[in-house]
Curated annotation (Swiss-Prot):
<dbReference type="InterPro" id="IPR029132">
    <property type="entry name" value="CBAH/NAAA_C"/>
</dbReference>
<dbReference type="GO" id="GO:0062098">
    <property type="term" value="P:regulation of programmed necrotic cell death"/>
</dbReference>
<dbReference type="GO" id="GO:0017040">
    <property type="term" value="F:N-acylsphingosine amidohydrolase activity"/>
</dbReference>
<feature type="active site" description="Nucleophile">
    <location>
        <position position="143"/>
    </location>
</feature>
<dbReference type="GO" id="GO:0046514">
    <property type="term" value="P:ceramide catabolic process"/>
</dbReference>
<comment type="similarity">
    <text>Belongs to the acid ceramidase family.</text>
</comment>
<comment type="function">
    <text>Lysosomal ceramidase that hydrolyzes sphingolipid ceramides into sphingosine and free fatty acids at acidic pH. Ceramides, sphingosine, and its phosphorylated form sphingosine-1-phosphate are bioactive lipids that mediate cellular signaling pathways regulating several biological processes including cell proliferation, apoptosis and differentiation. Has a higher catalytic efficiency towards C12-ceramides versus other ceramides. Also catalyzes the reverse reaction allowing the synthesis of ceramides from fatty acids and sphingosine.</text>
</comment>
<feature type="glycosylation site" description="N-linked (GlcNAc...) asparagine">
    <location>
        <position position="342"/>
    </location>
</feature>
<keyword id="KW-0746">Sphingolipid metabolism</keyword>
<dbReference type="GO" id="GO:0030216">
    <property type="term" value="P:keratinocyte differentiation"/>
</dbReference>
<keyword id="KW-0458">Lysosome</keyword>
<feature type="signal peptide">
    <location>
        <begin position="1"/>
        <end position="21"/>
    </location>
</feature>
<feature type="glycosylation site" description="N-linked (GlcNAc...) asparagine">
    <location>
        <position position="259"/>
    </location>
</feature>
<keyword id="KW-0964">Secreted</keyword>
<comment type="pathway">
    <text>Lipid metabolism; sphingolipid metabolism.</text>
</comment>
<dbReference type="GO" id="GO:0005764">
    <property type="term" value="C:lysosome"/>
</dbReference>
<dbReference type="GO" id="GO:0017064">
    <property type="term" value="F:fatty acid amide hydrolase activity"/>
</dbReference>
Length: 395
């Protein structure tokens, strides 16, 4: 009994230390300034652009991109398989993924199944592993998204894509394995029809859903994971068992980006469509007041929190916790983000200062793969690979 008490005290002390660390130097810092244009140790580099031709058959749309990125995709798929085999050394789970997963999941909606088949063919990676790579993003996306309105009613959308928590820690360089392997897979995409842009997005090569994007002149959209007991695993299980009346969240965001023609239409679809996993949809428009965070359960919308500059609400911030609840004490990115926005002020919000906010620890952390900045009205869309050199919190 005394031994158990000592273990409990050690665990409690460790948890308290981590909680305190996230809110004290060197794990946090004063709000950064003058970090834009990106440079220095927190800037890994630019993100390449590729065109996805929607006039091509779905099977062929990703051919050019995946020829370039196949080696990097194989690296991350092999890492995921190795992690699975660590827990189930027999290799049976990977065998089921390769042989059974496509049949278990059945037909995917719209063009997505044919697109994944095309990616599998080009990369010589089994279709089941390509499907599991796409499912992966329904479950592990940890992010910070912001929509802010300046004094002139102009909107700016910013997001940090954080990904890879608990998916392998490299003790040699203090980084998350999957986070680092995603950086060379990060791409900017220009989806075109009839040689004209339909929408633009930042994504990971091999993933056919969308996590961050915008429709020039109309709206911007980012997706954050929402942790819930009634979560994505249940939705996927229902899908396998034949209940297919809900959409995969990444497929929904892509469908909205591709087909919606206004902020209100996008908001309506994101609010009402049944989805497989709980999520936060962060949506920005092209005029004053058009910005919101949609908190979703799998079957319904729980909350739509909108900009209202006249009432002093000139920004909305979303991490991975419901806005009416306190964030998990080991993972509070919301408080420092809001603090830095308040210090920036509505008079001074811009691409430059939004990047400053997203560059401040712990909003920037070891999980941060990239930062995206969007100006819908001006048609600006910029994505930058990030690093968080030590001392830096793990999430």
């Amino acid at each position: 009994m005394p031994g158990r008490s000592r273990v409990a005290l050690v665990l409690l002390a460790a948890a308290v230390s981590c909680a305190v660390a996230q809110h004290a130097p060197p794990w946090t810092e004063d709000c950064r300034k003058s970090t834009y244009p990106p440079s220095g140790p927190t800037y890994r580099g630019p993100v390449p652009w590729y065109t996805i031709n929607l006039d091509l058959p779905p099977y062929k749309r990703w051919h050019e991109l995946m020829l370039d990125k196949a080696p990097m995709l194989k690296v991350i798929v092999n890492s995921l398989k190795n992690m699975i085999n660590t827990f189930v050394p027999s290799g049976k789970i990977v065998q089921v993924v390769d042989e059974k997963l496509p049949g278990l999941l059945g037909n995917f909606p719209g063009p997505f199944e044919e697109e994944m088949k095309g990616i599998a063919a080009v990369t010589d990676i089994p279709l089941g592993e390509i499907i599991s790579f796409n499912i992966f993003y329904e479950l592990f996306t940890i992010c910070t998204s912001i929509v802010a309105e300046d004094k002139k009613g102009h909107l700016i959308h910013g997001r940090n894509m954080d990904f890879g928590v608990f998916l392998g820690w490299n003790i040699n360089n203090d980084t998350w394995v999957i986070t680092e392997q995603l950086k060379p897979l990060t791409v900017n995409l220009d989806f075109q029809r009839n040689n004209k842009t339909v929408f633009k997005a930042s994504s990971f090569a091999g993933y056919v859903g969308m996590l961050t994007g915008f429709k020039p002149g109309l709206f911007s959209l980012s997706l954050n994971e929402r942790f819930s007991i009634n979560g994505g695993y249940l939705g996927i299980l229902e899908w396998i068992l034949g209940k297919k009346d809900a959409m995969w969240i990444g497929f929904l965001t892509r469908t909205v980006l591709e087909n919606s023609t206004s902020y209100e239409e996008a908001k309506n679809l994101l609010t009402k469509t049944k989805i497989l996993a709980p999520a936060y949809f962060i949506l920005g428009g092209n005029q004053s007041g058009e910005g919101c965070v949609i908190t979703r359960d799998r079957k319904e919308s729980l909350d739509v929190y909108e900009l209202d500059a006249k009432q002093g609400r000139w920004y909305v911030v979303q991490t991975n916790y419901d806005r009416w609840k306190h964030p998990f004490f080991l993972d509070d990115r919301r408080t420092p983000a809001k603090m830095c926005l308040n210090r920036t002020s509505q008079e001074n919000i811009s691409f430059e200062t939004m990047y400053d906010v997203l560059s401040t620890k712990p909003v920037l952390n070891k999980l941060t793969v990239y930062t995206t900045l969007i100006d819908v009205t001006k048609g600006q869309f910029e994505t930058y690979l990030r690093d968080c050199p030590d001392p830096c919190i793990g999430w």
